[in-house]
Regions:
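C-terminal/domain-terminus segments
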Residues: 148-172
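Extended, small-residue-rich solenoid/repeat segments and analogous flexible loops
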Residues: 1-48
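Flexible, glycine/small-residue-enriched loop-and-beta-strand segment within the central core
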Residues: 15-18, 40-51, 56-147, 174-175, ...
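Serine/threonine-rich low-complexity intrinsically disordered regions
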Residues: 7-9, 24, 133, 151, ...
């Protein structure tokens, strides 16, 4: 039986859950060789998730696939413990990306619709996130919808990234700002 929720005075059925997050490797859109998925990882909509060869996913991480988005994680990428990735708006992570523990990557947000209704009940808008090859996302950083992190870029611990990061840039802070550019 569906639970009823009130939305602006009208009762409507609550949408079904996306499931428990439990998964089988055979459910993934693609899973490469030598993939390590630690205990306690939850994967929602694994049929929309692709993991390349040699990907590591740390314990307690949530890969929140979405029925109409794709999540693609490239070969050799390392995902630390207790990360949260949401791919309603498509998420593409390149090869050999280092992702520290507790990183959040979000591809959706609530649309601004004024104060006539609660934010929770506003439309969901999506925007893809791209993290290019060889980038590094520091512990606890947050990547917001629509952001493109360039090749070899480095995001500092705890940074909130709301705009694009150029290739080989080092950014940090809230909001994230350019600190320097990496050189050979």
């Amino acid at each position: 039986m569906n639970t009823m929720v009130e939305d602006t005075g009208i009762l409507r059925p609550m949408r079904r859950s996306h499931g428990s997050g439990r998964f089988k490797r055979s459910q993934f859109a693609r899973i490469g060789q030598n993939v390590i998925i630690e205990a306690g990882v939850l994967v929602f909509h694994p049929e929309t998730v692709e993991l390349g060869d040699g990907v590591y996913v740390g314990h307690g991480t949530i890969l929140k696939g979405y029925y109409r988005g794709r999540m693609v994680i490239g070969d050799g990428t390392w995902i630390g413990q207790q990360c949260f990735f949401h791919s309603a708006g498509d998420l593409s992570i390149g090869r050999n990306v280092g992702i520290g523990p507790g990183v959040k990557i979000i591809t959706s947000s609530h649309a601004e619709e004024g104060i006539s209704k609660p934010i929770l009940h506003s439309r969901i808008q999506t925007a893809p996130v791209v993290v290019e090859d060889d980038a590094d996302l520091g512990v606890g950083s947050v990547i917001l919808p629509g952001v493109h992190v360039g090749k070899g870029a480095q995001v500092g611990a705890g940074a909130v990234v709301a705009s694009d990061v150029p290739p080989y840039a080092v950014v940090a802070g809230v909001p994230a700002r350019l600190i320097r550019t990496r050189t050979k």
